[in-house]
Amino acid sequence: MGVGKEVSFKESFFLSHGNPAMLADESFIARNFLLGWKKNVFPVKPKSILVVSAHWETDVPCVSAGQYPNVIYDFTEVPASMFQMKYPAPGCPKLAKRVQELLIAGGFKSAKLDEERGFDHSSWVPLSMMCPEADIPVCQLSVQPGLDATHHFNVGRALAPLKGEGVLFIGSGGAVHPSDDTPHWFDGVAPWAAEFDQWLEDALLEGRYEDVNNYQTKAPEGWKLAHPIPEHFLPLHVAMGAGGEKSKAELIYRTWDHGTLGYASYKFTSI
């Protein structure tokens, strides 16, 4: 049983959520993309939102199932005002149960509900700018960094029917997300970052999803700097899988911080 048939979507999205400080610091130009979400990217109000979070790591897929989740202040080095901010969107236990049902039906041995999990900054920070009214129910889905990209693609494939039930599907991570100790690049974009980012764009727009799933052997060597650990890349694979059996990828935004942190974001539309 679905979660509703009032609206139906063909799109799933991957967003590079970037530095959480952008919520309070207007110097971040990526704010403009998120603030313009409803006007420029997705004007239809969904029934609910499912966010695949780079900041929730588990051994098996877990989905937040609480009715009134709190926000999690899982960051440092941000304006002090952010620790007073809230995002009072309700949870959606019905959607959480539907996610669990679809994953089990899709062949996953385990999919857990977590009634205590709050909204981490993968969701509440971008949603505060995208949907500031906080009147749309939200669930979060975890990633499994111990499992490969194909696993995450298959998670998305199993959850693709949600789009037809009025659920806005968002993978929230980072297209290029190096370690914190990676030196900044002050002359444009670091060559390794630009090369990986361009490879990713080309592979997605050309429909070479298998190459993206196998990025550790298909991508330029710079992938080791772009994603030294995979948790920020895996939400892209879930969103890519949620595009459905056939989908077309589109780059919808790109900018950089410090020449190394890439904000490329994509839309996957079923055709």
Curated annotation (Swiss-Prot):
Keywords of the record: Cytoplasm, Dioxygenase, Iron, Metal-binding, Oxidoreductase, Zinc
* GO MF entries: ferrous iron binding; stizolobate synthase activity; zinc ion binding
Q: In which pathway does it act?
A: Pigment biosynthesis; betalain biosynthesis
Q: Which positions does UniProt annotate for Zn(2+) binding? A: H17, H55, H177, H232
Return the CDD domains for the record.
45_DOPA_Dioxygenase (cd07363)
Task: Copy out the cofactor comment.
Answer: Binds 1 zinc ion per subunit.
Kindly state the tissue distribution recorded for this protein.
Expressed only in colored petals and pigmented tissues, absent from green stems and leaves.
Query: Which SUPFAM superfamilies does the annotation name?
Result: LigB-like
Q: Which Pfam families does the annotation name?
A: LigB
Required cofactor names: Zn(2+); Fe(2+)
Record EC number: 1.13.11.29
Tell me where it resides: Cytoplasm
Name the GO cellular-component terms.
cytoplasm
Gene3D superfamilies for the chain? LigB-like (3.40.830.10)
What is this enzyme's catalytic activity, as reactions? L-dopa + O2 = 4-(L-alanin-3-yl)-2-hydroxy-cis,cis-muconate 6-semialdehyde + H(+)
Entry function: Opens the cyclic ring of dihydroxy-phenylalanine (DOPA) between carbons 4 and 5, thus producing an unstable seco-DOPA that rearranges nonenzymatically to betalamic acid.
- Additional detail: In contrary to the fungal dioxygenase (AC P87064), this enzyme does not have a significant 2,3-ring-cleaving activity.
Q: Which family does it belong to?
A: Belongs to the DODA-type extradiol aromatic ring-opening dioxygenase family.
Q: What is the protein's given name?
A: 4,5-DOPA dioxygenase extradiol
State the organism of origin.
Portulaca grandiflora (Rose moss)
The lineage, from the top, is: Eukaryota, Viridiplantae, Streptophyta, Embryophyta, Tracheophyta
Q: Coding gene?
A: DODA
